[in-house]
Structure formats: structure tokens, C-alpha cells
């Protein structure tokens, strides 16, 4: 699709205010998704747009939204209790980012009457309610959970359902992510409060069955728009995707070397890990080994700190952000030169979203995924599944591997000493490794990413663990890949640097020394049985086994006899004598269980030969 200039829109043309703000961003031409979606939305069509991440979807809905709200304001000014537009986003980071872009439009003097409010989890809901009661904003930018909560609130002198009766425009941003995060019910509930006479824009990086269902429920006769910068790829055109094969025990050293290299120091780097626990650990362990760069960590379980971390990442040159998939969608931070993935993500589509944090808005960018030797088939899998070509990172592999092997002992010593100096770091390391192993078992492409192919001892070495954790996956581990600390360490004497945690640990230690039981630890009580009960249980088990054996012998003998008499192909018929014998066997077994006959008498009656040792 050919690109058009923003000023070329003429059916209808953009207002001077909106056009001036867009041009102040430095954008002269529209991206393909903007070229396709904006005229349709301005023509009051419902639109479902699929476009690769980083393709300019935010302006594709903000621009027509502002134009539609202005038109209505000229006809009938917006009232003090009217909400004209809703923008629903899957995460608070993305919602906040949209709000920041929108704020730049609303600073224009001709758009000041279109005020907005950001409503996301993590903020005080009482403050949100107070603001909505005091001055209803024309535009709400929100996450679905908080918005649903406000719709359902009663008794707070707030009637949000009444305030959206004049709604003109609804945006469902990153719709596939909304559904992936389990917001399907919330979104459907929200749709039930909204008027049907509205325009809806649904934007998504992928079209799934769930998204199709949402389109049917929330859009009226929508126009479907599918825009890709290249028909043969699923990622931004100026993104270079690389991979590197590394041995499991060398993975952290390889990451450390990469983050220290001149190629990555010039810009920001995002490093994706599989779990929150992994981010927690490496955010503690990496900074001492990478002192020249600012290292930040963010994950989904962080509630109130996430906004501050993202803001610090934006404002810090050459920063390194360790994160989970909570930031795989929508985050638009300038100067991200590299996106690095510790290992393949749980789904192939997540790979596309992760690498889309760089090479945004037509800029260049790079992405690198570390693969183990057993994971090399992932390169072909990604090409078939997501149309993503991975190129091997051009390095002197033999020299790199040799250099990393030489650095491994020193790096491990630093990790070991970090954990030995603070039990908090030790705990985080253990949790990170266990969570990583568990996450690995849940890969979408488990046919090629198999847990049984991994040397878990070598993986534990990469984490610098002081010992291997107790977990089912390591129960029968026989490998010698794990490298223990070079110095002696008494794990029972590790202390927390956090004074409060250390105080709790010391109290538990005192209780343990007095009682022999660690406080809070689940006790597994063994059932106590008398000697007679134990003997009887063993006797019952043995008797049942012998009875099954005797019946099996009789059956074989009967089959052999039937075969000799030429009746083997007929269904076996039981005579009255056979039935009587079976009933006698059952009576004998019952008498044995009640101790009315001895085991020896039972064996003789059953014709079972004893074992002579």
C-alpha cells in the first residue's frame, strides 16, 4: 500500500489543530495502517485492523477519534457529565503511553475542551471516583479491569453507565492481548453498558478465533483491514533478527559479554525472561557485574512501581531493562537498539510482539535470541509458524565460546559470593531457576523444546546457584554439569541483608533449635500402625498375589486342554464343578483374612507349592 501525506486527507480533511500536532511529531507521511484505517473511521465505519507491532496503530485511532469528538462538539457541545470516547488497553503501561500521546494533542488551544482521564489499576480507585464525580472527562483511557469495576460500583454517587450514553467512539487496542490476559468477560460486560450507535475501532497484531468472536460481538458491519509492511514477514521491515547457539552453562556469561560489547552500549536494551522470578533474581545479580550500565527490572507482579521503572528507562541513556511479557506489547520507547531474549518465549506469537519493541515507526532495530544446542530447530519452526527469518549472529564462535569458558569461573564466583552474602539473593536465585524449568515445560512448541533434552545441572550453573534445588525434575538427575561454589558455604548460616527478614529468620532458627521443627513448614505425618496390623496387611497382599497366580495357572491349563480337544476357538463354558471350585477358593481367602486358617493351610488347600530356601 502506497503511503500518503497527512495533509492529503480530504474526505474529510483533518482539522488544523490535529494536523499541526501530528506534524510536530515529525511525521509527514502516514504508515500503511494509518492510510487504510483513518479514512474509514472518519467515514463512521467500524474497523478491525490487523497490523504488525510498531506500525503506528496509536495515531490510527487517536486522530479519527479527536476529529469525531470535535465534530460532535460543534453540533452540540459536550456536557459536564458526558463521556465521548473510551480507549481500552490491556496493560497500564500501554494505557499510560496512549494517554501521554493524547495529552500532546489536548495541549493545543483548539482541543483543550476535550479533556481526558487515565484510569488504570495501581492508582487509587477512590481518587478515580472523586475525579469522575467532580468533572467527567470527555475521553477515558483505561484498562478493562478498573473500568468494569467502576461500571459495577453502586452507592458511590457515581453512575458511569449514564455518562456513556452519548459515547461516540470506542477503541479496543491490542485486542488479542486483551483476550490473552483473560479480560474476555470484562470486555463483554463493558460492551453491555455502551450504546450501539457508536463507532468502534479494534486494533490487533494478530487475528485469533477469540478476536473474531469479539469482532462479532462488539462491531457492526466492520471493515476488515490487514496491513503488513511486507507480505512475507510478520515483523517490522527494518528489524534484523539474529540468533546465537550457546551452551547452557555459558548463557549468562554470553549475555554479560553481549551487554558489555560496543554494539549494544550505544542504545537501550530490553532483555526478556520467562518468569517474574527470573527478572527478580537477575535484577539483583546483574548490576554488580555490569557497573557501567543502569539495569532495571519490571514484571507483572510489580504493581505500583511499574510506571516509575518505565519512566526511568525512557529517561536513562544506554539503560538495560529486564522484563517479562508484560512489556511485550505496545511499549514505545525511543532509542531501543536491541531486544534480547534469554530463551524462546512460550508462544511463537510472543516472539513477534517482543521483537516489535524495536524498529518502530520505520526506524532500524535489532533482536537476538539465545538458543541452546538442543533448540536449534526453533529457527525453522519460527520461519514456518510466524514467517520470521532468523540470521545467525556473525561472531567468531569458537573464539567466543573459548573466551566465555575462560570467564565462567570468575563470573560464577561473583554470583556465588552475591548469594552467600545475602540469603535474599540466594532465595531469588532458587525461585528463578525452578520457575524457569516449570515455564519450559509449558512451551507451545514442546515438540522441539523438550525438558528431557536439557542438562538441568548446566542450567543451574548459569544461574550461579549455591546448590541444586529439590524438585521433581531433578529427582533422578545423574549429570555432572552442575558447578558448585569454589569455597565452602554453610547454607544454614546464610543471613538476610534486609533487617526485617533477618529478624524473622533468627526467630524461626530459635524455634527450630528448641523444637527440631521449622516454623511454618508443612509436616508430613506418617500413619502409625501396630505390628499386628502391618503383618496382616503384608499377609493380605501376599495372599492376593498367590490367589491371582493360582487362577492364572488354572486358566492356562484350561486353555491348553481346550486346544488339545479342538475347542479352543469356542467360547469357554464353565461347568458347575468349576463354579463350585471358584466359590470354595473365595471362601478360603475370606477365612484367611479373618485369621481362621493359617497361611500354610491356605497354601495346601489352594495347591500352591511352598518356597524352600
UniProtKB/Swiss-Prot annotation:
One Gene Ontology molecular-function label: RNA helicase activity
Record's compositionally biased regions (Basic and acidic residues): 528-544
Domain Helicase C-terminal: start-end pairs: 251-409
Occurrences of domain Helicase ATP-binding (ranges): 38-225
Keyword Membrane applies: no
SMART domains linked to this entry: DEXDc (SM00487), DUF4217 (SM01178), HELICc (SM00490)
Gene3D superfamilies membership: P-loop containing nucleotide triphosphate hydrolases (3.40.50.300)
Sequence motif DEAD box, location on chain: 173-176
Biased composition (Basic residues): 545-555
Binding site for ATP: 51-58
Keywords: ATP-binding, Coiled coil, Helicase, Hydrolase, Nucleotide-binding, RNA-binding
Placement of sequence motif Q motif: 7-35
Coiled coil stretches, renumbered: 540-596
Region (Disordered): 505-578
Function (record text): Probable ATP-binding RNA helicase.
Protein name: Probable ATP-dependent RNA helicase DDX55 homolog
Organism: Drosophila melanogaster
Lineage: Eukaryota, Metazoa, Ecdysozoa, Arthropoda, Hexapoda
